[in-house]
């Protein structure tokens, strides 16, 4: 073996040690790989991508399984361990997974209930955002002003003069039209001049095409801000709160507790108006890529490096 090799060997060993120490950054100091999922709608996909980007920036190796489907397949994947975390809503946790009959209107109580209830699956809820992705009703500004409609009560009083568009099952679910009709049976009854069903993803088209006066909405829909619509106030507290939060397997959080602070830093930034604007960048005329929108938002708020 040559003298030159022996002189070079210490340098190689030092470099190898350095690479090993630094290269482990992609797997975090603990070497943990995290699989991040999401449901198959714009908002949930956006927030899931943000979780993934934040964790990657913190040094974790991240696998993405985004836009898996609806609540059922995504939650099952989490329970089975195919996912480690995904964005879920407190209202969904209560009414779907925990099967609570009465909707919870208080955000803090909703959080306390899901945190306690999800212990049976060894799952933990981190800090929820203030954004409330709950159901409601949206109208064009000129229509709302014409009839003086600002609240659900106002809508009930004028319902017989208006046309409603709604997504599948809204006319048969107790937390939809039937429940509202019971509440307002002496105030217009929530009985519309005409009502028709439309695919969930197309629910704003009838307003655009002047085929309906009112549509069922979600509080963080990008179309509300993008189209300049009026979101009616739920003055009777009919719909439960739906605050989004990271839902994560306890074993992963125990192994890397720093995950909590990293993801919790996002919560205060996800307000109704912020999420509406994010959704509109994807669903509006610009049709930006979800990955681009999520990354730029995090860079702008200094949650990840540019």
Where do the protein language model's features map onto the residues?
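C-terminal motif of bacterial Sec signal peptides marking the signal peptidase cleavage site
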Residues: 17-21
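Bacterial signal peptide processing site
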Residues: 23-26
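Bilobed "Venus flytrap"/periplasmic-binding protein-like clamshell domains
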Residues: 31-68, 130-204, 288-291
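An extracytoplasmic/periplasmic, membrane-proximal ligand-sensing/linker region
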Residues: 43, 175, 181-186, 258-306
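Short helices/loops that flank or line small-molecule/ion binding pockets
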Residues: 53-54, 72-83, 101, 179-183, ...
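A bilobed periplasmic-binding-protein/Venus flytrap-type ligand-binding module shared by bacterial periplasmic
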Residues: 135-145, 243-256
């Amino acid at each position: 073996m040559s003298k030159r090799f022996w002189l070079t060997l210490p340098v190689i060993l030092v470099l190898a040690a350095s690479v090993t120490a630094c290269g482990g950054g992609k797997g975090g100091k603990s070497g943990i790989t995290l699989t991040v999922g999401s449901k198959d709608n714009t908002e949930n996909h956006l927030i899931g991508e943000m979780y993934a980007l934040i964790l990657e920036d913190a040094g974790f190796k991240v696998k993405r399984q985004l836009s898996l489907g609806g609540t059922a397949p995504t939650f099952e994947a989490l329970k089975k361990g195919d996912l480690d975390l995904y964005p879920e809503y407190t209202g969904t946790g209560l009414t779907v997974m925990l099967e609570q009959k009465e909707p919870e209107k208080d955000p803090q109580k909703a959080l306390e209930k899901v945190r306690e209830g999800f212990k049976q699956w060894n799952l933990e809820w981190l800090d929820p955002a203030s954004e409330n992705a709950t159901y409601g009703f949206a109208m064009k500004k000129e229509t709302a002003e014409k009839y003086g409609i600002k609240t659900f009560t106002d809508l009930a009083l004028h319902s017989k003069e208006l046309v409603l568009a709604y997504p599948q099952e809204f006319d048969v679910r107790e937390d939809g039209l039937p429940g509202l009709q019971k509440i307002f049976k002496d105030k217009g009854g929530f009985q519309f001049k005409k009502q028709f069903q439309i695919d969930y993803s197309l629910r704003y088209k009838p307003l655009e095409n002047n085929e309906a006066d009112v549509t069922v909405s979600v509080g963080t829909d990008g179309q509300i801000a993008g189209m300049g619509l009026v979101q009616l106030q739920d003055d009777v507290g009919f719909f439960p709160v739906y605050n989004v939060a990271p839902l994560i397997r306890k074993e992963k959080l125990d192994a890397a507790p720093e995950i909590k602070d990293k993801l919790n830093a996002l919560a205060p930034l996800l307000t109704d108006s912020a999420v509406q604007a994010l959704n509109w960048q994807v669903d509006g005329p610009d049709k930006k890529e979800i990955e681009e929108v999520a990354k730029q938002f995090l860079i702008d708020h200094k949650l990840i490096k540019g």
